[in-house]
Each structure stands twice: as structure tokens, then as C-alpha cells.
């Protein structure tokens, strides 16, 4: 009977073992949240708006906890690129290059110098036009990152055999605002946040099955929601709110007025600030 128990335990533990992957995963497009699907399925505007985005700063001052490097920030520093992508993918705006403006100006100087010297390439013989000016600017920042906002778990153990699970919620918050280039007036502003879920599931056995015979085994699984995807989702949600607010306040309009009751617009229009937990 004891040999049978040992055999069963060994089979169970061997079945729980997972071999490391033989090769790294192939490159793929970045996974996106529901907010991206909503953003790309908004109704069309009467006309696209020229917009400039300079720099979305990280104002949290948070760094990754030990044992990560003390110089690694807790949130990605690529919020500007994420916002430009969200504005373009919404099909409501035409983003103008401003983050790398100096590089663009340098390249234009090189072309003009070549045109003056008569050594310009065929594809650059046409005189350069003036850069397009934006109607509005979208400013903003990452205004908060709180770790361990909520945590918990559950587990049970009986005669040395048991399992448990634990979870932790972090939170990241973003501010976005639309600024009128002509007057400097802030036309619209919104704060959005996204929770970041991390959880762990583990099971194990620690039991003497006979005198001087110890059965010990464990298995576990950990999943951490990528902070980058959560930040991107918060920015995409903020862009949808800005578009919705601009429609309601007459800053811009829909191509088809009947689409004011579009399911996506209605969903975000009726979203309310959740109560403090």
C-alpha cells in the first residue's frame, strides 16, 4: 500500500513539472486591451484635428522595489509615444512630430543646404513647405503609481498537503488635458486610472509516508499584468473621454450627428467615478 502511495505521489509530481521552453517566443504585435478596441471603433469626426504632443512626464517619482535596480522606474517612460499612437489610432486627430522636433529641423537644414549647393538628391528637389501648426496640444503626465493598494489570499492545508493563492493590486493614474494653441486655454481635462493585477498560485506536499521516508513536492505559478499595457489602456481611455467631452461641449463634432448615441460613446459618457474602497 505504501509503495502504491509513493508511486501515485511521484506520478503526480512528475505531471506537475514543466520543462523550460526550447526556444524563445516569436515576435508578435503587442496585445491590446478592450480600451483599444473601443478607441479604434469610434464614429468618425467631421474633420481630423491637427494636434501636437511634446512630453508626457512621469511625476510619480516611484522606483521598482528591491531586488530590482534602484535606478529602474516603476512605470514606463514611453507615455508620449503611447499617447501619440492612441491619438492617431482614434482617427480623430493628426499628430504632428514634436518630441523629435530638433531632429526634424536638423534634417530639413541638411536638405536646404543641399538645395542651395545644387547637390540635392532627386527626391528632395522640391522646396520644403513650412511645418504644419497644430490647432490644439494634448498635455499630461503620469500622476500616480501606488503599489499594494489591495492584497489578499486564501489557502488550506491538511496533513501536510495543501494549496494557496495570493493576489496584489497596484494602481497607475494618468492626467490628460487639451490646450487651445491660440489662447492657451485648457479646453478639457481628465484623470484616468488602471489597476495592475499580480497573483500567485502554489501547492505542495510535505509528509512522512513511512519511518525516515519523507515525501516533499511543490508547484507554483505567478502572473504579473504588464505595467506597460496598463499605462497604455489608461491613456487610451483618457483619449476616448476627451473626444466624448469635446463632442458634448461643442469643441468638435461627429460626421453623422445620429451617432451621438453610439454604444461606445454612451458607455464612456455614463462612466462615473468609482467610490473609494
UniProtKB/Swiss-Prot annotation:
It is found in: Cell membrane. A lipid is attached at residue 16 (N-palmitoyl cysteine). The keyword Signal applies. It comes from the Bacteria. A lipid is attached at residue 16 (S-diacylglycerol cysteine). One of its GO terms (cellular component) is plasma membrane. Residues 1-15 form the signal peptide. The keyword Transcription does not apply. It holds the Pfam family CsgG. InterPro entries: Curli_assmbl/transp-comp_CsgG. Keywords: Cell membrane, Lipoprotein, Membrane, Palmitate, Signal. It is a lipid-anchor. Belongs to the CsgG family. May be involved in the biogenesis of curli organelles. This is Curli production assembly/transport component CsgG. It comes from Citrobacter koseri (strain ATCC BAA-895 / CDC 4225-83 / SGSC4696). The gene is csgG.
